[in-house]
Amino acid sequence: MLILNNEEETKKLAKLLAQSLKPNDIVLLNGDLGAGKTFFCREIIKHFCGENTNIISPTFNLLQTYKTSNFTIYHYDLYRLKSPEEIYELGFEEALNGNLILIEWSEIIKHLLTPPLIEVNLEVLDENKRLCSIITNSSESSLIDFLQASPLFSTKLDIQRDKSPTRKIEL
């Protein structure tokens, strides 16, 4: 696991992860209120859409979309979702067709999702510090290899490689 000491380190990690993302990836962000899920998503969106992109939290409308030249980013916040079926009213089937999906508070629909999934877990340690882990159930090792090769965090990476479909990346 990686301790992110401040927002700058969180930005760096989000941008690093964004470099490995591609259409059809689904990223689940977990953590308590104020853990930094939306902040993390904003940095991923900025990577694809530009630093000056006006990024609005989907907390009240549950969904915000952002167009890139090749695909759309669907940013969901499911905190207020009452039932799993409501996700389909938010264009989820369309989102699954060649787009990047970011989901905050995904627990309510996780059973509907099929691999590969990338989970980013953020835990508040204090006002500025977060504990972060990334888990993927992808059979491909491209994400693991990419993060492991990064000069930004490579000295802190402890990658668990096993034959199970779930691979935990402890930063």
From Swiss-Prot:
Subcellular location: Cytoplasm
Broad class of where this protein is predominantly found: cytoplasm
Keywords of the record: ATP-binding, Cytoplasm, Magnesium, Metal-binding, Nucleotide-binding, tRNA processing
Binding locations of Mg(2+): T38, E104
Gene3D superfamilies cross-referenced by the UniProt entry: P-loop containing nucleotide triphosphate hydrolases
GO cellular component: cytoplasm
Function: Required for the formation of a threonylcarbamoyl group on adenosine at position 37 (t(6)A37) in tRNAs that read codons beginning with adenine. Is involved in the transfer of the threonylcarbamoyl moiety of threonylcarbamoyl-AMP (TC-AMP) to the N6 group of A37, together with TsaD and TsaB. TsaE seems to play an indirect role in the t(6)A biosynthesis pathway, possibly in regulating the core enzymatic function of TsaD.
Protein name in the entry: tRNA threonylcarbamoyladenosine biosynthesis protein TsaE
Species assigned in the record: Rickettsia felis (strain ATCC VR-1525 / URRWXCal2) (Rickettsia azadi)
Organism lineage: Bacteria, Pseudomonadati, Pseudomonadota, Alphaproteobacteria, Rickettsiales
